[in-house]
Design a protein with these regions (language model features):
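Catalytic micro-motifs at enzyme active sites that drive phosphoryl/nucleotidyl and oxygen chemistry
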Residues: 86-87, 109-114, 245-249
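Intrinsic-disorder/low-complexity, polar/charged segments enriched in Ser/Thr/Lys/Arg/Asp/Glu/Gln
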Residues: 107, 120-122, 256-260
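Polysaccharide-binding surfaces and accessory modules of carbohydrate-active proteins
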Residues: 9, 113-225, 270-313
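Short beta-strand and strand-turn-strand segments in soluble, beta-rich domains
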Residues: 104-106, 152-161, 235-245
C-alpha cells in the first residue's frame, strides 16, 4: 500500500494572496484580493500600521465593505458593484482601483482613488440607465470599521468595535457625516475617520446589526432593496461600520448620474468627535470636483469555484 506524504496545512500570508495594492505619500493604502474584494485599508507611518477596516477579506467569502446600486420598479433589486459578489470587471493603476460592468439595465463604473498626499479616499460611482424606461435608483456605501492595530482587531473584533465612538454631524452641503474614533489607545494614539457623500447622504447606519435585522434577513444583499431606508440611528455595538444612503434619483433612458463617497482619516485624534471636526472636510469638495478620468485595462476577477456553490443542507 502506497503511503501518502504528510500534508501540512498553513494559513496563507499576504505574499501568498496575490494582492493588488495602491498607496499614496501619506501612508494610506488599499489592498484588493484577486476576486476584487477589499482586503484591507491601512495607514502606515513610523513603523506603525493601523487598519481602518475591521476584518480582512477572504478569497472565498470576500469582505464586508461594498457599494450597491438599488433599483426600483415592480421587482426592486440591489446590485453589488465591488467585491466577490460583483459580476463586472476590475482593473488598477498607480492611484486608483476600478470596477465596471452592466447589470439589470444599468451600466456602472466605480473608481476608488487616493489623494496623492493626504489621508483622503474617494469612491466615485458613475451610472447610466440603459433601460427603455425611466428608472428610480439610489446608492448605498458600506465600510466596516476597526481603527486599530491588526493584532488588536483580530484578537477580538467585537471587543475592538465596542470601543469605537460614533458621532453624527450635519454638514451644510454634504448633510450627514459619520465620524468614528477608536477610544482604546493604539500605542498612545486614537485613530479617527469620517465618512460622507459629496452629494448629500439621506440615511445611515453605524453597525452591521442594523443592516441585518428581520426586514433584511432574507434579502440577497445586506443593503436591502430600493425603498428600504437605512435606520439613521446611532448604534454602538460589535460590528462597527459607516453605512450611507444617497438621495434617490430617477434616470431617463440613456441618462447618467454620479455619486462620490469619501473618507478622511487621522492617525491620532486626541479629543472626542464634535461638530468642529467638519473643518477637516474643507478640501473634500474641491478634490471631488477635480476628479480626472484615467484609461485602465479591465479584466474578469478570479472567482473561486466554491464561492457560488450551493450551501449544504
Amino acid at each position: 500500500m502506497t503511503q501518502r506524504p504528510n500534508e501540512i496545512m498553513k494559513t496563507p500570508r499576504r505574499d501568498d494572496l496575490h494582492l493588488t495594492r495602491i498607496s499614496n505619500a501619506s501612508g494610506l493604502s488599499v489592498s484588493v484580493l484577486p476576486n476584487s474584494a477589499i482586503f484591507a485599508i491601512e495607514h502606515s507611518k513610523d513603523d506603525r500600521s493601523i487598519m481602518i477596516n475591521q476584518t480582512l477579506a477572504l478569497p472565498i467569502e470576500g469582505g464586508m465593505a461594498g457599494i450597491f446600486i438599488r433599483i426600483g420598479g415592480d421587482k426592486p433589486v440591489s446590485i453589488p458593484l465591488v467585491g466577490q459578489k460583483a459580476r463586472g470587471h476590475f482593473g488598477a493603476v498607480e492611484d486608483r482601483l476600478v470596477w465596471a460592468g452592466a447589470e439589470q439595465g444599468m451600466r456602472y463604473q466605480v473608481s476608488l482613488s487616493l489623494h496623492p498626499k493626504k489621508n483622503h479616499l474617494f469612491w466615485r460611482l458613475e451610472i447610466t440607465n440603459q433601460r427603455e424606461a425611466a428608472t428610480s435608483c439610489d446608492a448605498v456605501f458600506i465600510q466596516d470599521l476597526g481603527l486599530g492595530d491588526a493584532g488588536f482587531l483580530m484578537n477580538n473584533e467585537a471587543y475592538a468595535s465596542q470601543y469605537i465612538d460614533h458621532h453624527i454631524a450635519q454638514h451644510p452641503k454634504m448633510k450627514t457625516i459619520l465620524m468614528a474614533r477608536q477610544n482604546q489607545s493604539q500605542g498612545g494614539s486614537f485613530p479617527w475617520v469620517a465618512h460622507g457623500c459629496a452629494e448629500g447622504a439621506v440615511g445611515f447606519a453605524t453597525d452591521f446589526r442594523q443592516l441585518m435585522g428581520k426586514d433584511l434577513r432574507d434579502a440577497d444583499f445586506i443593503a436591502g432593496a430600493f425603498g428600504i431606508d437605512l435606520p439613521s440611528e446611532r448604534l454602538q455595538y460589535e460590528t462597527a461600520c459607516a453605512a450611507l444612503q444617497s438621495k434617490s434619483i430617477t434616470l431617463a433612458p440613456s441618462q447618467s448620474a454620479c455619486w462620490t463617497f469619501f473618507s478622511v482619516f487621522q492617525p491620532d485624534h486626541p479629543a472626542a468627535s464634535s461638530q468642529a471636526d467638519l473643518a477637516l472636510l474643507e478640501e473634500i469638495e474641491e478634490a471631488v470636483n477635480h476628479f480626472k478620468p484615467a484609461a485602465i485595462a479591465l479584466s474578469q476577477p478570479t472567482i473561486s469555484v466554491l464561492q457560488d456553490a450551493p450551501a449544504a443542507i
